[in-house]
Design a protein with these regions (language model features):
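Accessory RNA-recognition modules of RNA-modification enzymes
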Residues: 1-237
């Protein structure tokens, strides 16, 4: 079932709120004030407290809307659906606004504290376009043994040959360890973890080996023990 709705406000999990005949609908890949056409998730019953759905067409876009930097993670109707990037359709300033409003609303609703919560980007994030920040990724091998991700709401696996959200260090490890070349048993769980150095790296040799590639829980490359390091106000932890 499809419906045309006016999006009202931000919600959680990268969704926004709209109403259909008085019922709350949580909509993926939408933005406040937009007029969109939504495909409702099945099943949806009239007795349900709320419905969920996803944008299939944007009739009146928000100024904060952008073309998804990673199309595979965008709406199903636009060739996406692999998940992992809930705000892929939102500009960088729009993402900050979304998060600031959401956190402030939760502080008010749960903590009864009315305060505007500032949200700031980490150094270098703007230059990276909001990408290259994940230090861990998980995939599943498709029927051809290639790393893939499941399309949302299905068992379909979509082969991938990169992960734009992953740090450049993680992507370098994946390339060096031939992860994108496949050769895995179909259905295998593939996990990569590469802690990102923050602050001064004291032991460079240890940092070079500070990663793990696991297949079905077994270490294929790297180290069993990983070290996370961060420097705050001059103190390294």
């Amino acid at each position: 079932m499809q419906a045309e709705v006016r999006i009202e406000r931000y919600a959680d999990q990268g969704r926004c709120v709209a109403h259909i005949d008085g019922r709350v609908v949580f909509v993926r890949f939408a933005l406040p004030d937009e007029l969109v056409r939504v495909e409702l998730d099945e099943p949806h019953d009239r007795d349900d407290r709320f419905w969920t759905g996803e944008v299939v067409e944007v009739l009146e876009p928000s100024v904060d809307r952008v073309t998804p930097a990673w199309p595979l993670a965008g709406p199903l109707a636009m060739g996406g659906g692999v998940g992992g990037a809930d705000l892929v359709h939102v500009s960088l300033p729009g993402q900050l606004k979304w998060k600031a409003i959401t956190v402030s609303e939760q502080m008010s609703r749960l903590g009864h504290i009315d305060v505007a919560v500032p949200i700031e980007r980490m150094p270098g994030d703007k230059a990276a376009g909001g990408l290259n920040w994940r230090t861990r990724i998980e995939m599943i091998a498709d029927d051809n043994g290639m790393p893939s991700m499941r399309r949302r709401g299905t068992h379909n696996r979509v082969a991938i040959d990169t992960m734009p959200l992953a740090t450049r260090t993680l992507l370098d490890v994946a390339k060096r360890e031939h992860v994108w070349e496949g050769g895995f048993e179909p259905g295998s769980q593939i996990r990569l973890s590469v802690p990102e150095p923050r602050g001064e790296i004291v032991d460079t040799a240890a940092a070079d080996d500070n990663y793990a590639v696991l297949v079905d829980g077994e270490l294929r490359a790297g180290s069993q023990l990983l070290t996370e390091q961060v420097t705050i106000n001059g103190t390294t932890f």
